[in-house]
Amino acid sequence: KEGYPTNSEGCKITXLFNDPYCKGXCINLSTQAD
């Protein structure tokens, strides 16, 4: 996962674009507090 966004904002953004490298983190952060 190195080289890919792992912070909440980055994951939210990549999630919008369905980034497979951050999808898990995106979903994880989306279900948690903003």
From Swiss-Prot:
Residue ranges occupied by any LCN-type CS-alpha/beta domain in the UniProt entry: 1-34
Expression sites by tissue: Expressed by the venom gland.
Free-text domain note: Has the structural arrangement of an alpha-helix connected to antiparallel beta-sheets by disulfide bonds (CS-alpha/beta).
Family statement: Belongs to the long (4 C-C) scorpion toxin superfamily. Sodium channel inhibitor family.
Entry protein name: Non-toxic venom protein
Known function: Does not cause symptoms of intoxication, paralysis or death in insects (A.domestica).
Gene Ontology MF terms in the entry: ion channel inhibitor activity
GO cellular component: extracellular region
Gene3D superfamilies registered for this protein in UniProt: Knottin, scorpion toxin-like
UniProt keywords, alphabetically: Disulfide bond, Secreted
Subcellular location, record wording: Secreted
Record flagged with keyword DNA repair: no
UniProt keyword Chloroplast, yes or no: no
Species the sequence originates in: Rhopalurus junceus
